[in-house]
UniProtKB/Swiss-Prot annotation:
One Pfam entry name: Sod_Cu
Catalytic activity, reaction form: 2 superoxide + 2 H(+) = H2O2 + O2
Binding site for Cu cation: 47, 49, 64, 121
GO molecular function: copper ion binding; oxidoreductase activity, acting on a sulfur group of donors, oxygen as acceptor; superoxide dismutase activity
Compositionally biased residues, Basic and acidic residues: 124-137
Gene Ontology biological process terms from the UniProt entry: cell redox homeostasis; copper ion transport; fungal-type cell wall organization; intracellular copper ion homeostasis; intracellular zinc ion homeostasis; negative regulation of cellular respiration; positive regulation of transcription by RNA polymerase II; protein stabilization
EC code(s) of this entry: 1.15.1.1
Descriptive protein name: Superoxide dismutase [Cu-Zn]
Listed cofactors: Cu cation; Zn(2+)
Similarity-based family: Belongs to the Cu-Zn superoxide dismutase family.
């Protein structure tokens, strides 16, 4: 079992943790989040980005992790960036907890997300279904108020 964690924070009040667990290379990865400080009753996009670099804030993380050169999509779409995690929903206090399994996200093997960055976005991800070119790149998910590099967990 490989476990990894990202401690998410940034220039905003948003903070939290995103954990990843994978038992073997061909098994799905369980992604669990506990994020606070968002807008109340909102959906916010979350993605794994290419680089584990936060030297210039979350902007340094680069584009979505996309080793197969696909267009942006929903986590359940076959055609999507590997890093497309979709949206999480916040409660009346702006907090979000949840868990999902994803067969594209890997901790083991050449496409591991360890060392890359999880970004929490300021808007709702349109899952590549928007009517403009940006939708196919970013899902129109907005700015990057919080992020964290994915590291190996104990």
């Amino acid at each position: 079992m490989v476990k990894a964690v990202a401690t998410v924070r940034g220039d905003s009040k948003i903070s939290g943790t995103v954990t990843f667990e994978q038992s073997e290379e061909n098994s799905p990865t369980t992604i669990t989040w506990n994020i606070t400080g968002n807008d109340a009753n909102a959906e916010r996009g979350m993605h794994v980005h290419q680089f584990g670099d936060n030297t210039n804030g979350c902007t340094s993380a680069g584009p979505h992790f996309n080793p197969h050169g696909q267009t942006h999509g929903a986590p359940t779409d076959e055609v999507r960036h590997v890093g497309d995690l979709g949206n999480f929903k916040t409660d009346a206090q702006g907090n979000a907890t949840g868990s999902v399994q994803d067969s594209h996200i890997k901790l083991i093997g050449p496409l591991s997300v360890i060392g890359r960055t999880v970004v929490v976005h300021s808007g709702t991800d349109d899952l590549g279904k928007g009517e403009n070119e940006e939708s196919k790149k970013t899902g129109n998910a907005g700015t990057r108020p919080a992020c964290g590099v994915i590291g190996i967990a104990a």
